[in-house]
């Protein structure tokens, strides 16, 4: 990789990692540091998503440092970190994807089935679901820990790069293209890409239809049947719900854009047996897109959620005043529950 190409990649990966790490740390602090916000089921899921995204960004750093800085796939770190990093990277990636699916199902129940929401989406049920999800992804990703190790390769030991960094090995899969590994990768493709994409798209489409088409309150905004107070509340609900829909669409769009290209390459090579040799720069770009998904969620919260922007100002400027505030939580269904609760949505 030439210097002209390498420098932009270095800057891009560094900026992406820094922005993603700082953004997710702020989300974690904003929720975990506020007792009122921790009472919201939705915020528990957002906290879980931020933890998974933050850890995923951290454990992908050993993956992109060698190719971005040195133009190779050499492993720079102790050998035992190869299977550990690869395993944890996949665990947190799978947890991030599955948490997004849990979030969309929770939103569907809260919006489309509000009468069942209190029972189905209780704090206890959500915590159990999150725990089961982490156990599942930890078990599912275990082949990465078992079948990855550092492979020594022949290198020119007289080169300056070898003398400085001892670049002579790669962290790679030890079973190659065995049938069972291809079957595992196909299962991974279905479980953590195709099925989540299908469920998220279908569920959020139904949520959007419910918000835009089926709620008579949204269509009553300008009618004379509402008094001024009710009209104002309806207008506020309309604006809130529009922002929710925009955020849901943005999440789905980012998910597709970030993961579709690299999954198409995998499907073509592993399943359809199509011979593809994309340029190495293209592979780096695909990995950068995958990282972008983990880094973008805090930006989406800031862009679409007024409550998150308000909480962000509290964290950055007046953290001591947050606990003294009594907040009102407005549910997504235009039903207000007065009390010490807060949510980003």
Swiss-Prot record:
Keywords in alphabetical order: Cell membrane, Disulfide bond, G-protein coupled receptor, Membrane, Receptor, Transducer, Transmembrane, Transmembrane helix
CDD domains: 7tm_classA_rhodopsin-like
GO BP terms: G protein-coupled receptor signaling pathway
Disulfide partners: 82-171
Residue ranges annotated as Cytoplasmic topological domain: 33-40, 112-125, 209-246, 305-345
Example of a GO cellular component annotation carried by this entry: plasma membrane
PANTHER family (alphabetical): LEUCOKININ RECEPTOR-RELATED, OPSIN RH2
Protein's job: Probable receptor for neuropeptide ligand nlp-8 that plays a role in octopamine signaling and specifically, the octopamine inhibition of aversion responses in olfactory sensory neurons. Plays a crucial role in daf-7 expression. Acts in concert with gpa-4 to activate TGF-beta-like daf-7 secretion in the ASI neuron, thereby promoting larval development and inhibition of dauer diapause. Suppresses immune response against pathogenic infection by inhibiting transcription regulators elt-2 and hlh-30 in ASJ neuron. Promotes pathogen avoidance behavior via intestinal gon-2, independent of aerotaxis.
Protein name: Neuropeptide receptor 15
């Amino acid at each position: 990789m030439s210097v002209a190409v390498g420098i932009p990649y270095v800057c891009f990966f560094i900026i992406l990692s820094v922005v993603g790490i700082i953004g997710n740390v702020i989300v974690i602090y904003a929720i975990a540091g506020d007792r009122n916000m921790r009472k919201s089921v939705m915020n528990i899921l957002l906290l879980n998503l931020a933890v998974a995204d933050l850890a995923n960004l951290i454990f992908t750093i050993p993956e992109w440092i060698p190719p971005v800085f040195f133009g190779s796939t050499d492993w720079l770190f102790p050998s035992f970190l190869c299977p550990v990093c690869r395993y944890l990277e996949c665990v947190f990636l799978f947890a991030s994807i599955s948490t997004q699916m849990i979030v969309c199902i929770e939103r569907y129940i809260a919006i489309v089935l509000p009468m069942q929401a209190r029972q189905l989406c209780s704090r206890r049920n959500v915590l159990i679901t999150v725990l089961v999800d982490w156990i599942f992804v930890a078990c599912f990703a275990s082949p990465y820990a078992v079948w990855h190790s550092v492979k020594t390769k022949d290198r020119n030991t007289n080169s300056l790069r070898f003398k400085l960094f001892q670049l002579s090995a790669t962290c790679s899969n030890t079973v190659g293209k065995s049938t069972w590994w291809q079957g595992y990768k196909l299962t991974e493709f279905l479980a953590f890409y195709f099925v989540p994409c299908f469920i998220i798209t279908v569920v959020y489409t139904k949520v959007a239809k419910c918000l835009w088409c089926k709620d008579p309150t949204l269509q009553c905004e300008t009618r004379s049947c509402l008094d001024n107070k009710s009209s104002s509340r309806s207008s506020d609900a309309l604006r809130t719900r529009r922002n929710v829909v925009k955020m849901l669409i943005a999440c789905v769009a980012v998910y597709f854009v970030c993961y579709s290209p690299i999954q198409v390459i995998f499907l073509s090579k592993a399943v359809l047996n199509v011979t593809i040799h994309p340029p190495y720069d293209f592979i780096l770009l695909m990995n950068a897109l995958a990282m972008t998904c983990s880094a973008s969620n805090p930006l989406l919260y800031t862009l679409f959620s007024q409550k998150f922007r308000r909480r962000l100002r509290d964290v950055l400027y007046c953290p001591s005043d947050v606990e003294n505030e009594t907040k009102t939580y407005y549910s997504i269904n235009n039903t207000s529950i007065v009390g010490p609760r807060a949510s980003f949505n």
